Amino acid sequence: MFVVKMVLGFLILLSPLCATGLDISQTDIIERSLNFLLFVGILWYFSAKKLRSFLRSKSLEISKRLEEIQAQLKVSKENKKKLLKELEQAKEKAELIVSDANKEAYMITQKYELQTKMDVENLIKNSKALMDLEVKKIKRELVESVFKDLRESKKVSFNAQDCVNILKQRL
């Protein structure tokens, strides 16, 4: 079929030469053309099967490679979707961790503020208690020294009951 198409095509190309009215009787164009067509036909006859099988194998290789690439593309798209999903989950988890850390930091701050406040109050109470104790101690020492001075001076006489009453009133 191909050979017939070639011959027809060749004749169509030669038809303008025939219509010009040139004298081509002295040329061997027809013999050369027939030899060329015969050569192409024989070449086609012997190489057509090999050429077809070669082209088929190449097209099969190309289609296999295309299928492999499409499979890889599909896997890549699935991996991309999976990784994007994991990224979103990681972002949500990070936001949750940050919010929990902020809450925990606030709670720890409140705890330490409360503990510090209690410690300060305890220190104030303890210092007041120590001051009261020191005041009582100083009063007692003062009263004792005054009584001692009064007893040693012997200008004033006290009995034991009077000393007890004075001490009860002052301390």
Curated annotation (Swiss-Prot):
Membrane topology classification: Single-pass membrane protein
Presence of the UniProt keyword Transmembrane helix in the record: yes
Record keywords: ATP synthesis, Cell inner membrane, Cell membrane, CF(0), Hydrogen ion transport, Ion transport, Membrane, Transmembrane, Transmembrane helix, Transport
Keyword check for Protein biosynthesis: no
GO cellular component terms listed in the entry, alphabetical order: plasma membrane; proton-transporting ATP synthase complex
Pfam families named among the record's database cross-references: ATP-synt_B (PF00430)
Membrane spanning stretches: 2-22
Subcellular location: Cell inner membrane
Disulfide bonds: none
Gene Ontology molecular function, alphabetical: proton-transporting ATP synthase activity, rotational mechanism
Main location class: membrane
SUPFAM superfamilies linked: F1F0 ATP synthase subunit B, membrane domain (SSF81573)
Function: F(1)F(0) ATP synthase produces ATP from ADP in the presence of a proton or sodium gradient. F-type ATPases consist of two structural domains, F(1) containing the extramembraneous catalytic core and F(0) containing the membrane proton channel, linked together by a central stalk and a peripheral stalk. During catalysis, ATP synthesis in the catalytic domain of F(1) is coupled via a rotary mechanism of the central stalk subunits to proton translocation.
Matches recorded under NCBIfam families: PRK08475.1 (NF006292)
Family, similarity comment: Belongs to the ATPase B chain family.
Known partners and oligomeric status: F-type ATPases have 2 components, F(1) - the catalytic core - and F(0) - the membrane proton channel. F(1) has five subunits: alpha(3), beta(3), gamma(1), delta(1), epsilon(1). F(0) has three main subunits: a(1), b(2) and c(10-14). The alpha and beta chains form an alternating ring which encloses part of the gamma chain. F(1) is attached to F(0) by a central stalk formed by the gamma and epsilon chains, while a peripheral stalk is formed by the delta and b chains.
Name of the protein: ATP synthase subunit b
Origin species: Helicobacter pylori (strain ATCC 700392 / 26695)
